[in-house]
Amino acid sequence: MALDLSALRRIIAGENRLFTGADIPVEYQSDVLGRVHGSAEALAFPLSTEEVSALLRYAHEHRVPVTPRGAGTNLVGSTVPLEGGIILDLSRMDRVLELDEDTMTVTVEPGMLLQDLQAYVEARGLFYPPDPGEKASSIGGNISTNAGGMRAVKYGVTRDYVRGLEVVLADGTVMQVGGNELHPIC
């Protein structure tokens, strides 16, 4: 498959945000144990939902496979580009967007590291229970694998703490599911 690099550069503009061919670091092509291998044609670092949407729209229209990636701990092999295409690295989308203490919710981007989220809420006297073995994993990765860890028996797993998501579908459509609304008990 031949990617239109000029189209990708219009979507993912800026220094050190789009890599192709031999410029893609080798750690992006296999799992952490070196058992699963793949090969992508491009590696993109979006900074916004709009860029993710535009990139997925391009990939959908041109039938290019996309492999999303968070922190890349890759302990389950899910971020290896087995079908080639584009690696969509969300690690630079790593901000807290909102903390709502009334609803006890925090809205973060998918690349936020678990250890950073835990430190953020703990500094405010709050607690985020899911605690998988890899502290440098991303929240997006935790959601995609429903990570739990040693606290799961007492507190549950990641899905138990997700109230809503902003998702970008494979065709680039942006969708809001759930939310942080509190519903009174009657």
Task: Say what each PLM segment does.
Residues V64-P65, F127:
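Residue-level detector of anion-binding/catalytic polar loops
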Residues G70-T73, G133:
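Short, ordered loop/turn segments at secondary-structure junctions
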